[in-house]
């Protein structure tokens, strides 16, 4: 069937040309605005705005323009359609200030937050709303708003003289056919091979690097990974309930002096547990009045913070392909410019006095063989599993059950296992010598849903230190700008603030403390370091999209991330 396409905008073409003098923006609309009613065999689309002119020619950052239209199904059954921008050209340099939002109050596609308008230097059709279903005789009423957000904290003059043009269309939905893996390879035609694994921060787009992976004694296969300051490894997949604890427009910190905890409140109870302790405009809860008063420069405010929750899209960064052709992802927050690319904070294990506590799961004490019995969940696994249960269970069918998350407990060369004397694990030797590997040779360390020797309850884990080394990190070495992708958000800043985060990889045993590899935050940008298992750090889950997934849209950029098709008939 030939695809039906119906125009929706004010005229056959809406072109907005923005030019700038300093911070002053002007806009010109080409095309007259009129009432338009276009009827196909299946849909009737009515553009209800009386004209398409922006109010005045002179606008500043903060400008917005809205258009309203209706879609009525006059066919004999349910109809599925897409809302697209045809022939989009968007040459704005910034990615986050030019935004759009589609709203509908009568069953149509509805966005709760603004999304970034994708960039395109050449004409490109871009889907804004995918597979919208409308029943026979029903009408969907829409408002589309496009705005240029004002940010007084930055110089927005980089967008001077840039342009935006395109046409909003309705088209009949057609199920996508390209697999995400194929799209990834097509969008990254440059394949490199690295032999030196010092810190790597080179900016790149359209580049993958090749390595190999072997699980147990299975066949070794080629895998492909992103490294350095990769710009096109963004994915939007799943939704989460994002919470915030706010006082006077600022986020509040939860402090527990007894347990030496300092983090974001995890629930409404923590957020409103006490009055506010004001430390010079940094607001805390969880302290008693006497604890607050005992800190220099603070004051006790007899008011409460406010707790709120909202559904948000989840953004991820592609780590690599796996040996089963799935695609492994690292959690990157609820927006590309997030500085909270973590789901909370947790110790790796709340006990440290035995080597077995470096295990993502562990067994009993006394020997490495006993440690690998994997009958107990680590503290961090419990935390990750609970997050998954609360956020991603509806998406389980899209995730690989064979993808491996390697908790390599092999010993370093020349080391002997002991519960009383210090020793090191193999990842310390590899990363110190800049020789990472994707291989996971012992099946009791190769955690996956389908591996009975190291069985996961859910298809989720953590990133290994070897994966972080391949991505561009180096032991005891601070990254320099433009950094490596695992460290940065779309603004080129730390995506997880000053917090560090645990990797999945063991480091060693001191004779009294179990140690795991970890990654530093902004105080020591992206250093691959280590931490006692009892230290609470940020938690960044990792999942793997199955090879059966189809790509619905996107090019991997932060403003136009890859999106997985989650309709019927995929990964069943």
Where are the regions that the model predicts?
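Short acidic/proline- and small/hydrophobic-mixed sequence motifs that coincide with surface turns
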Residues: 31, 76-81, 93-95
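A surface/secretory-pathway sequence property marking extracellular, secreted
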Residues: 38-47, 89-126
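Long, domain-scale functional regions
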Residues: 176-572
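C-terminal, structured domain-capping segment
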Residues: 63-79, 84, 88, 128-176
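Short, solvent-exposed aromatic-acidic interface loops
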Residues: 86-90, 334-336
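Short, polar/proline-rich extracytoplasmic segments that appear immediately after membrane translocation
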Residues: 1-61, 160-176
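Extracellular adhesion/glycan-binding regions together with long Ser/Thr-
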Residues: 56, 108-147
